[in-house]
Amino acid sequence: MKKGLVSLLAGATLTLTMASHSFAADKITVFAAASLTNALNEISEQYKKDTNVEVVASYASSSTLARQIEQGAPANLFISADQQWMDFAIDKKLMVENTRYTLLGNELVLIAPKDAKIDKVEINKQTDWKKLLDGGRLAVGDPDHVPVGIYAKEALSNLGAWETVDPLLARTNNVRSGMALVERQEAPLGIVYGSDAVASQKVKVVGVFPADTHKPVEIPNGDC
């Protein structure tokens, strides 16, 4: 996914939020999935220049953000990395009714350090993950609660590789922490979203998980 498209859509979301709410006109508090850090930071700066309205963004895994909102953390807008944690927020009646919609989609990709010898990995049922990792760990958000990890577990399970890969995971609290392990070459491979990969100069995409191995990677948002 092109970084500019992410920024454009994030900007459109903020504009719609301003138009549909009566909260304080000098500040918008956004709780956003860590995968949107770069795009939302850029659009927030431009938005303030254009409107004199400050966008205060808090980034973490969607599970962490949803639970913070449940505990009373103030937010005007919640942007989740998957539908599951938006479902959670809605079920807990933390969101304004009828404000949920899918902001954009994403890809699930395999990354390696920029200077790694690995250039292309065909991800299928024949992929030899142990050989690819060569004694190292596969960095990914914790599949127990982090959306990117949940998608990764689903994809690897459908490829018949989960039992092999599970003990080899380096589990992190959010997608950006997983990518950071690959950037620092502490892990030879990682699973992130396409939007994260293009935001880093230190990693490269070496494979894309087939779309039919996991649920669509969708980024929903809603007003709190």
Where are these regions (language model features)?
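Sec/Tat signal peptide C-region and signal peptidase I cleavage site
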Residues: 18-24
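Exported/periplasmic ABC-transporter solute-binding proteins
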Residues: 24-50, 54-73, 82-83, 87-106, ...
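Hydrophobic helical h-region of N-terminal Sec-dependent signal peptides
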Residues: 9-14, 18
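Short active-site segment of divalent metal-dependent hydrolases/proteases
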Residues: 79
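Bacterial N-terminal signal peptides that target proteins for export
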Residues: 1-9
